[in-house]
Every structure is written in C-alpha cells, then in structure tokens.
Amino acid sequence: MSRVGKLPVKIPEKVKVSVDGNVVKVEGPKGKMHFPTNPLVSVQVDKGEVKVARQDESHVAKGLHGLTRTLVKNALEGVVKGYEKGLEINGVGFKAEVKGKEIHFTLGFSHPVVFKLPDGVTAEVDAKQTKLTIRSVDKHLLGLTAAKVRALRPPEPYKGKGIKYADETIRRKEGKTGAA
C-alpha cells in the first residue's frame, strides 16, 4: 500500500470538492481549479475527507495512487492559502516591470523581452524592479511559469548575472588568470 496515498486528506472550511468522472474540482476562497485523474485511481469525497484508492496492484497504479493524493492535497492548500515563488534579477541595468498580464524584462539584449502570464498566475515587482514574486493557486502551473521566466536569462557562473530563484545559490567559477 502506498504510504502517501492511503492517508485521507481533510477538506478545510470554506472549500468545496467534487468529483465528476475522472475530474476533481476544488473551489475555495482564493480561487478554483480542476485536474484530471487516471482511470487506475478513484477519488471519493465523504465526511469532510478526500480518499484516494487504486483499482489494481500494478506498478503504475501504485505510483499514481500517491501522486493523485498529493495533487488533491496541493489543490486544497492552493485554493485556501495560495502559492508564491520569488525570483531575483541580477545584473547592471537588468529589471522587470509588470503591465497587466505581461512582464516586460530588460535583460541586456538589444530588445526588451515580453513574457505573457498564463491565466491564474499573477506577478508583482518590488520598487527596485529586481525582485519578482509570482503567485497562483496551482502549484504545478506556478513552478512551470517560474521556470520559463528563469529560462529567459539563466544565471551565469562568472558574475551571477541573470534571473535566479530567490532561494537558489549559484555556483561561481573563477575567471581566467593572466599568463605569468
């Protein structure tokens, strides 16, 4: 039995969970989301808890059992608290600016870089325009969006210029030394 999957997930107050076939729908104070589940796994809602069970004992079903339970837990936590990820922009003249559903970056290229935010994701920049905070109720979409933003200008190892996660440490390299 999956040690993660067998644990029931408690439904917080002000959250509504429904299962429609293979689609789990979650609504809460911060927003709503839905995601599909695999037919090898069944999801039931009863007495303020969500329980996940697998249909057979195959290796694939065992893996999907724990995954589905974690996806349900993340969805419940997301619609109540929400998720956020911080990014830092390092480099001379590097900055970001949020305009509606777009982030405009100045990253040392000959042109500004425009990044369109997906639905359900919001962003804000601090006063210095070097710290970017991305928020969403969907943990997966948040991580994907943060990775795409970081990929616009990944940090380089010599001076550390680029976009990095707030909690990321860049392994620095030493530059060339002159011939003796």
From Swiss-Prot:
Q: Which GO terms describe its cellular component?
A: cytosolic large ribosomal subunit
Superkingdom as given in the UniProt entry: Bacteria
Q: Which SUPFAM superfamilies match?
A: Ribosomal protein L6
Molecular function as annotated in GO? rRNA binding; structural constituent of ribosome
Q: Name one GO biological process term.
A: cytoplasmic translation
**Sorted UniProt keywords:** Ribonucleoprotein, Ribosomal protein, RNA-binding, rRNA-binding
Tell me which Pfam families the record gives: Ribosomal_L6
Q: Which InterPro entries match?
A: Ribosomal_uL6-like (IPR000702), Ribosomal_uL6-like_a/b-dom_sf (IPR036789), Ribosomal_uL6_a/b-dom (IPR020040), Ribosomal_uL6_bac-type (IPR019906), Ribosomal_uL6_CS (IPR002358)
Q: What does this protein do?
A: This protein binds to the 23S rRNA, and is important in its secondary structure. It is located near the subunit interface in the base of the L7/L12 stalk, and near the tRNA binding site of the peptidyltransferase center.
Query: How does this protein assemble?
Result: Part of the 50S ribosomal subunit.
Question: NCBIfam families given for it?
Answer: L6_bact
Q: What family is this protein classified in?
A: Belongs to the universal ribosomal protein uL6 family.
* PANTHER family for this protein: 60S/50S RIBOSOMAL PROTEIN L6/L9 (PTHR11655), LARGE RIBOSOMAL SUBUNIT PROTEIN UL6M (PTHR11655:SF14)
Please state what the protein is called.
Large ribosomal subunit protein uL6
The organism is Anaeromyxobacter dehalogenans (strain 2CP-1 / ATCC BAA-258)
